[in-house]
């Protein structure tokens, strides 16, 4: 969190960004003053602290990934034992992918504090295609789609990333934060489909979590500030037990060990599903680019380098291929985990990589996984909502620091309106096929609109003169 620092000067104004204060003078120049409130990107905390801080990341990640195999399995009518196989594969892939992204291997991996997890984007098509063609065909589509996307993004990385100017990336991150806020509110109310959804007690638990976390973050020193999310979760979980909201029975019911099985349901290829999944894989990588920008901004107040961007894309592509081999969906970056880094100030990639190790272990030890998954949704919602708000603000800061021309302002405004507008009224795209509606709303809609407009609205001398005039004032 940003420390309260105000610089009063006629010629400067203070811009608060993550853990750094950016001082912008009247000519638009930025001076960055780093405020050390946690562990930075390449710092490795002592092992005891690493374990504690990683637990915060594990809790958020497990809550995000567990519903993916559960929803797909239930949607296509799998037995409980078959769903268990999907869950094990999902956790194993999330752990491996996170380690690959944070620690890296050669050119692979962004080496930023990013959790890669099985994506909700693929749940709806997974149910639809799995029910119609079988899970083996869906697995084949995920495998081929991941390979195609990885090859295209690797070969044409420079050309593709050149289209994503900072103001476009900022717009994508901002819409990502806005779209995720609805998920956070849903968790606060009890979780989608919960029998007690909207219960005032749920909202009070969420509010209590937010208040405790922010107070510790604002006034706590050292450990209390950095572990604010974990401490608030523990306190509010104990309080939730008084209201009968904490159910520990699933821990006793789970087995101690299970082994993930690759290609348990077989694999088969069909052109139609392959095309659909390939498009969605491309969309997932657009979202990754936004999350990479957010992670770099929160950890080091900069945009990701070309090497980090390409390495992150390669890590997501390879992990999606591995995920397909375990009959699971392609991976995507965990935005909530990135936001959590911004809240606690612990942006160390080693903390996140340790979380990946534990999540991978959870894939063979269901009882350990159950310990993390019994936390009531409203409490997780309080943490998630705060994290998503951090993502939203980081996107706003990228846009603000871009010193927009009138042309770029138009592009940002229209692209935000399209992405946010369609996501607020999804029924307006009901007549379109799934892949088309996915391209037009939310993050993909914002990115696609911004890219098209940036190609149509060419830069001219008037834009340059306008920007120079603003700088001289």
Give the ranges of each region predicted by the language model:
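Intrinsically disordered, low-complexity non-transmembrane regions of multi-pass membrane transporters
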Residues: 12, 19, 24-53, 248-260, ...
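Short, non-helical or kinked segments that cap or interrupt transmembrane helices
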Residues: 107-120, 162-169, 224-230, 328-337, ...
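Membrane-embedded alpha-helical modules
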Residues: 129-249, 356, 360-465
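Membrane-embedded helical hairpins/re-entrant loop segments and their flanking transmembrane helices
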Residues: 47, 73-111, 278-349, 468-472
């Amino acid at each position: 969190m940003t420390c309260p620092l105000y610089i009063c000067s006629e010629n400067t104004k203070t811009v608060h960004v993550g853990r750094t204060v950016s001082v912008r003078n009247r000519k638009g120049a930025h001076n960055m003053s780093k405020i050390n409130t946690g562990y930075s990107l390449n710092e490795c905390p002592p092992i005891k602290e690493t374990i504690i801080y990683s637990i915060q990341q594990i809790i958020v990640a497990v809550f995000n990934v567990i519903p993916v195999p559960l929803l797909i399995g239930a949607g296509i009518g799998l037995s409980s034992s078959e769903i268990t196989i999907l869950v094990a594969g999902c956790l194993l892939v999330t752990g491996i992918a996170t380690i690959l992204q944070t620690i890296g291997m050669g050119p692979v991996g962004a080496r930023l504090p990013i959790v890669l997890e099985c994506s909700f984007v693929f749940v709806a098509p997974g149910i639809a295609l799995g029910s119609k063609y079988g899970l083996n065909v869906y697995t084949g589509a995920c495998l081929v789609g991941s390979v195609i996307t990885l090859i295209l993004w690797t070969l044409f990385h420079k050309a593709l990333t050149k289209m994503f100017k900072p103001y476009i990336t900022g717009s994508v991150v901002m819409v990502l934060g806005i779209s995720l806020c609805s998920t956070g509110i849903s968790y606060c109310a009890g979780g989608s489909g919960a029998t007690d959804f909207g219960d005032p007690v749920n909202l009070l638990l969420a509010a209590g979590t937010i208040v405790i976390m922010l107070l510790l973050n604002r006034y706590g020193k050292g450990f209390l500030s950095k572990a604010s999310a974990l401490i608030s979760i523990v306190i509010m979980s104990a309080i939730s037990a008084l209201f009968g909201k904490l159910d520990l029975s699933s821990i006793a019911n789970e087995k101690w060990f299970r082994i993930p099985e690759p290609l348990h349901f077989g694999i088969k290829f069909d052109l139609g599903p392959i095309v659909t999944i390939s498009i969605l894989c491309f969309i997932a990588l657009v979202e990754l680019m936004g999350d990479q920008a957010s992670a770099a901004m929160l950890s080091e107040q900069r945009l990701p380098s070309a090497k980090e961007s390409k390495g992150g894309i390669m890590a997501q592509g390879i992990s999606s291929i591995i995920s397909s081999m375990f009959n699971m969906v392609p991976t995507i970056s965990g935005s909530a985990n990135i936001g959590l880094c911004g809240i606690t100030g612990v942006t160390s990639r080693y903390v996140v990589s340790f979380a990946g190790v534990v999540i991978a272990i959870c894939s063979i030890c269901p009882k350990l996984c159950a310990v993390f998954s019994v936390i009531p949704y409203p409490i997780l919602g309080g943490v998630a909502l705060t994290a998503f708000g951090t993502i939203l603000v980081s996107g706003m800061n990228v846009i603000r620091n871009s010193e927009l021309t009138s042309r770029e302002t138009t592009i940002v405004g229209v692209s935000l309106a399209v992405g946010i507008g369609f996501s607020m009224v999804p029924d307006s795209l009901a007549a379109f096929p799934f892949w088309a509606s996915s391209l037009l709303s939310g993050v993909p809609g914002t990115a696609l609109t911004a890219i098209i407009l940036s190609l149509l609205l060419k830069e001219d001398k008037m834009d340059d003169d306008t920007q120079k005039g603003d700088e001289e004032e």
